[in-house]
Swiss-Prot record:
Protein's UniProt name: Protein SprT-like
Transferase keyword on record: no
Residues binding Zn(2+), per UniProt: H64, H68
Organism whose genome encodes this protein: Streptococcus equi subsp. zooepidemicus (strain MGCS10565)
Disulfide bonds: none
Length: 145
């Protein structure tokens, strides 16, 4: 079964409405589970969500994107802040936020000497320039093991 067929199946089962466009995988998505494109109606999904969190969570993300999709084509509020979106998302048991991916690997750990706030970073920072955002204390680098 292709991704588009899966989305069509979820749309009919959970919304009772057909999905008439295309759905595709997009490995470049980092922090979102999916995206809806109003211009042409297609949906993109993050395959890492399915790999790391399983089919149940992925189905909830498909429902989330289908809420955007169906509300847009019905002429109702399809953005996250709109009441129609929030109500439909609750009705179909969609996820409001995508779960964090475990594949995020921090290479650097910085600790504030004053308040102990920890900062994970993929790239190194210049300790002579940057300070703690909470208390403006000095940062030190801790070795990641």
């Amino acid at each position: 079964m292709t991704l588009t067929d899966y989305v069509r199946e979820v749309s009919l089962a959970d919304f009772g409405k057909p999905f008439k466009h295309q759905a595709s995988w997009n490995r470049r998505l980092r922090t979102t589970g999916g995206r809806f494109f109003p211009k042409d109606g297609h949906l993109d999904f993050n395959p890492k969500i399915l790999e790391e969190h399983g089919e149940t969570v992925f189905r909830q993300i498909v429902r989330h994107e289908l809420c955007h999709y169906h509300l847009y084509f019905e002429g109702l509020g399809f953005r996250h802040k709109d009441q129609a979106f929030k109500e439909l998302l609750d009705q179909v048991d969609g996820l409001r936020y995508a779960p964090r991916l475990q594949s995020h690997q921090a290479n650097y750990l910085y600790i504030c000497q004053h308040c102990g706030q920890a900062y994970d970073r993929k790239r190194p920072i210049n300790l002579a320039v940057f300070a703690c955002g909470r208390c403006h204390g000095r940062l030190i680098e801790k070795n990641q093991s």
